[in-house]
Amino acid sequence: MHGDVRTDDYYWMNERDHPDVLAYLEAENQYYEHMTAHTRPLQQQLFEEMKARIKEDDESVPFKYNGYWYYTRFEKGKNYPLYCRRNNTMLSPEEIMFDNNEMAIGHSYFKQAGYSVSENNELAAFGTDTVSRRQYTLQVKNLKTGELYPEEIENTTGRAIWAGDNETFFYTRKEPQTLRSNQIYRHRLGTSVTEDVLVYEEFDETFDVGIFKSKSREFIFIGASSTLTSEYRYSRANGPDFNFEIVQERTRGLEYGISHFGDYFYLVTNADGATNFKLVKTPISATTKDNWEEVIPHREDTLLEDIEIFEEFLVVEERREGLNQINIKRWDGTDDYYLDFDSETY
């Protein structure tokens, strides 16, 4: 630029698989091992102290989804989690869907990016990374037989969203160099990955894309977001055409998140100067901004952070004077209260 030519003497290190780069890294590792050899007893001591403070046989709080209780647990002396579930009640026999300790055998690195279970509770899509590059290979497991389907979809975020037919799922691909999530594909179980349909592609390099299903399981949303702007598309989860329609076209500075309940979409948004955000709703049949109806107005002293929708309640996460608050409202208007916690700084 401006006649100033500069040489990057380290550009060759950009090729992570080049023999010279690998040799350099190996030499650096050997140098480190040599220079820190005298600290190995201390390293082991610190490791044991930190491990002693960890509950090795830990278990997550279970959550119920579509008739099953799902949870993650660890076993003492093992490094990786087990993803489990129980049918209808936590007293039912445990089903181990994924044992990452077994799956990690033979790999110097292993990470599973969660899982997504089909509507009939029989299939689970899951992503694994064995390189530590956050480029997950997506696969499908039959939870009844333990069989893995032959499809392997590479360079994904590792998560899939099932349609209602138990055969179709959507997934997100990454741009290979930058790892920006930029493409949404549709796959039909039992078909070649080469036949997958590109549903959406984001060309603006300042935006990432993702896909998720509404809590009601009736809609699938594609979201595109940058630092200051967001945009969503929606389709019925049961298809069959999966034509995604825009909720509200992106406008720089306009942010909104989306949920579904009944005949409406509910949006947490900063529209119309709502710097602390407000809650609006819009009919599913008319989603553009001119149809938005205010549910919770903007408040100068309260930041509206998020909402959670239940069959009988709307739960609102707020922050006032720097403290978190949880407001619970009945849909029928008969109750509206804040949860009382023992400490202000919960």
Question: Each PLM stretch: what is its role?
Answer:
Residues 1-3:
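Charged, compositionally biased N-terminal leader segments and the immediate start
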Residues 5-12, 16-41, 45-68, 72-96, ...:
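Peripheral, non-catalytic segments that deliver or gate enzyme domains
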